[in-house]
Amino acid sequence: MNLKSIFENNDEKPLDNIPADGGYTAIFRTIACVGDSLSSGEFEADNGNGGSSYHDMFEYSWGQFMGRMCGSRVYNMSRGGMTAKEYCEGFADANGYWNPKYAAQCYIIALGVNDLLGQKQELGSPDDITAEDKKTFAHYYAEIIEKYKKIQPRSKFFLMAMPSEGEKDG
């Protein structure tokens, strides 16, 4: 990959040139995706009663596509409807995700839609990160990072921005 073609091109658009081999993502041999339905490859299906059912289809998640492209092992530590609070208060423990066997060189955390837009949880502030009594989104999000940093101190973290409520394409 020629970095000059990226950094010296003011008109460069990252999605116009996606390397078929995953590019520099391949430096990470293990990647963990912590998130909600946007991370779990969730499919919606007709339940036959006029409603919908939802199914996590990890094989179709963007994390697994990325893993196949770059040859990395990707752990899906996600579920449709997931919140940072639920992840910390039971989901991670129940699924063994704090277990060092899932230690990764890279963690991609994509939470917030269900927390802030769905459950209208208080966002919080940096002061909440270490406050035990202030259970805000910021507190739980930081707790996830802190626990994985203890499991794998040299890991890198990529925090995904979430879509805005009512955001339009274009």
For each of these PLM feature ranges, what is it?
Residues 17-20, 91-96, 143-145:
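A generic local structural motif
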Residues 30-35, 39, 73-78, 105-110, ...:
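Structural recognition of the beta-strand scaffold that forms the well-ordered cores
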Residues 44-135, 139:
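Conserved SGNH/GDSL esterase-like catalytic core that processes O-acyl groups on lipids
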